[in-house]
Amino acid sequence: MSDPNQPKPTSERHVPVLKDRCINLLAPGIEAARQRGETPVVIDATLGMGGHSEALLQRFPDLHLIGIDRDEEALALAGERLKPFADRTDLVHAVYDEIPDVLRDLGVSEVHGVLMDLGVSSLQLDERERGFAYSFDAPLDMRMDTSRGQTAADVVNNYSEEDLVRIIRKWGEEKFAGRIANRIVAAREAKPFATTGELVDTIRAVVPAGAAKTGGHPAKRTFQALRIEVNEELDVLERAVPAAVDALAMGGRVVVMSYHSLEDKIVKKVFQTGSKSSAPLGFPVELEEHKPELKTLTKGTEVPTADEIAENPRAASARLRAVERIRARRAA
């Protein structure tokens, strides 16, 4: 009988979202590499606890996987999980917009697949001391990379009221941003914020109780905004998606799962731009360099099935998009 006080194995703590669909979407890019006599290389740009990577390595015995994560704890756990495949993996402590640097350091010129599973991980939500969750009291941190950068406490204690309104409204899409920012500034004058519980209580005091019926937990949107600000998530994503596309070999694929509309808008824009002709309006012919570089593989976004959501409730808000490179990369 297992000891309830012992941490669960990584495989039990993390259920990969849309795992089978992700693997099936990446498979043709891997097969295209094989047909050219190349060793297939796939980047898991948001490695987390390694669930998607483990499944890829199990299915494709000749695959070389590059796993990237900014969270050192996640890298360590994934490293343990992927030990049986150590000779076919490179695990790198980096942010996923650093794909070009990672590939250069590894001597890799192009890859045949890139997977991105955005947002906060199960590990980060479950580890109380990380401060990502509003459901229990913890230090107000929210850094995905705990080795550097400002914390959520730094943001709420030092940002001006105007800046707090801006990020809570923009990143959290919170209609009560003004009320929340005003109360935060008033409360921190008496005592700086140190824990998530203190912040939750402050938000509860100004968000109408009825708002929770449609918007969920009153602190949900503010916590999202702070997490995005602390980790510069959307700025990173705006650089990361084009970098992933640029790294693709012919026939290679990028698969991205996003969890809120702000992320999905960025992914959609890059994919749509690459999937359209770049010929000037009214141009009489479409030259080769004007033809689309990408082919869209999903009609809009794909979502988890009811069965998958029942097994893994955190998958409920996942939205998947995928593209394939159909024209060679432009020369640098």
From Swiss-Prot:
Q: Which domain of life is it from?
A: Bacteria
Give the catalysed reaction(s), semicolon-separated: cytidine(1402) in 16S rRNA + S-adenosyl-L-methionine = N(4)-methylcytidine(1402) in 16S rRNA + S-adenosyl-L-homocysteine + H(+)
What is the recorded name of this protein? Ribosomal RNA small subunit methyltransferase H
Coiled-coil region list: none
Task: Please name the top-level EC class of this enzyme.
Answer: transferase
Has the keyword GTP-binding been applied to this entry?
no
The protein's location, in the record's own words, is: Cytoplasm
Q: Does the keyword Chloroplast apply?
A: no
Task: Enumerate the Gene Ontology biological process terms.
Answer: rRNA base methylation
Entry-linked Gene3D superfamilies: Putative methyltransferase TM0872, insert domain, Vaccinia Virus protein VP39
Biological function? Specifically methylates the N4 position of cytidine in position 1402 (C1402) of 16S rRNA.
Query: SUPFAM superfamilies, per this entry?
Result: Putative methyltransferase TM0872, insert domain, S-adenosyl-L-methionine-dependent methyltransferases
Organism this protein belongs to: Arthrobacter sp. (strain FB24)
Question: Which family does the UniProt entry place this protein in?
Answer: Belongs to the methyltransferase superfamily. RsmH family.
- NCBIfam families of this UniProt entry? 16S rRNA (cytosine(1402)-N(4))-methyltransferase RsmH
Q: What InterPro entries does the record point to? A: RsmH, SAM-dep_MeTrfase_MraW_recog, SAM-dependent_MTases_sf
Question: Which residues of the sequence carry a binding annotation for S-adenosyl-L-methionine?
Answer: 50-52, 69, 103, 117, 124
GO cellular component, alphabetical, reads: cytoplasm
Please provide the record's keywords in A-Z order.
Cytoplasm, Methyltransferase, rRNA processing, S-adenosyl-L-methionine, Transferase
Which Enzyme Commission number(s) are on file for it? 2.1.1.199
GO molecular function terms listed in the Swiss-Prot or TrEMBL record? rRNA (cytosine-N4-)-methyltransferase activity
